[in-house]
């Protein structure tokens, strides 16, 4: 009987030890699973963060590209509009009556205080009263023509005064470019 009790006691101790080991292994397994789940969640969160940063960078790059494209197109349209304004202004000046047209050039020449020299007409010039300018300002008509849609150049010694329509319109636009840009952008 004593042997049976010893065997029974050993069996009980064995069951207790097995149960303790099972619980210990179960706890280790649960801890391992919890640790791995936590690592997985941290990895997922890091991947989300990386993806979000990557998307933000791509979005920022795309927005920058779109802004650049928009600003380039806007600048192109503004430049095209300014060129159209220049052409329209040139056409309006050329369509003035001969009296008004010559009066404009009289004003420019008087402003420059020209006395003497050579008047060289622009290739596109066909309305200037050359005789009037030659007599009034002591000018001599040059044989050649300069590039331009109208007007002329006065040359005396080393001095050249460019009074072509192209130059005058260009200077007028350049002088007022800020105001023109504000009008084009609807700021005025």
Swiss-Prot record:
Presence of the UniProt keyword Transport in the record: yes
Domain of life: Bacteria
Single GO molecular function: proton-transporting ATP synthase activity, rotational mechanism
GO biological process: proton motive force-driven plasma membrane ATP synthesis
Annotated Gene Ontology cellular component terms: proton-transporting two-sector ATPase complex, catalytic domain
Signal peptide residue numbers: none
Record key words, sorted: ATP synthesis, Hydrogen ion transport, Ion transport, Transport
Function as written in the Swiss-Prot or TrEMBL entry: Produces ATP from ADP in the presence of a proton gradient across the membrane.
Family stated for the protein in its record: Belongs to the V-ATPase E subunit family.
Protein's name according to its UniProt entry: V-type proton ATPase subunit E
Source organism per UniProt: Dictyoglomus turgidum (strain DSM 6724 / Z-1310)
Taxon lineage: Bacteria, Pseudomonadati, Dictyoglomota, Dictyoglomia, Dictyoglomales
């Amino acid at each position: 009987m004593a042997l049976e009790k010893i065997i029974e006691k050993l069996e009980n101790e064995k069951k207790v030890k097995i149960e303790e080991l099972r619980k210990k292994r179960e706890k280790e397994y649960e801890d391992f699973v919890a640790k791995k789940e936590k690592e997985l969640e941290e990895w997922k969160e890091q991947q989300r963060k990386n993806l979000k940063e990557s998307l933000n960078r791509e979005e920022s790059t795309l927005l920058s590209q779109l802004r650049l494209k928009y600003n380039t197109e806007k600048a192109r349209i503004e430049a095209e509009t300014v060129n159209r304004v220049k052409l329209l202004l040139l056409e309006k000046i050329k369509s003035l009556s001969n009296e008004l047209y010559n009066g404009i050039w009289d004003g420019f020449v008087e402003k420059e205080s020209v006395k003497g020299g050579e008047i060289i007409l622009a290739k596109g010039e066909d309305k200037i009263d050359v005789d009037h300018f030659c007599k009034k300002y002591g000018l001599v008509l040059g044989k050649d023509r300069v590039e331009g849609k109208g007007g002329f150049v006065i040359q005396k010694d080393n001095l050249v005064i460019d009074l072509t329509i192209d130059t005058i319109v260009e200077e007028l636009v350049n002088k007022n470019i800020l105001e023109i840009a504000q009008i084009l952008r609807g700021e005025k």
